[in-house]
């Protein structure tokens, strides 16, 4: 997959957030983790992007996946890879 800007909005105590980070690391995805508990502006941005206060939220080049587990993240990532391979499919 071509290089993408990946931001993961997390809450430090959230087990689903830890699973998302583990999935990204296991798949060698470079990402920026943003703890919304310690950053009010990031929390507000997460809500603006996702429409909710629940974490995790991942943003990949403007595409949003919110309140997910590893299976949903794998499906989301697969769709992104498919779009990279077949740009007309968007």
Could you say what each language-model-derived stretch is?
Residues 50-58:
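Structural micro-motif
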Residues 1-27:
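Local sequence-structure signature of Cys/Sec-based thiol-disulfide redox active-site neighborhoods
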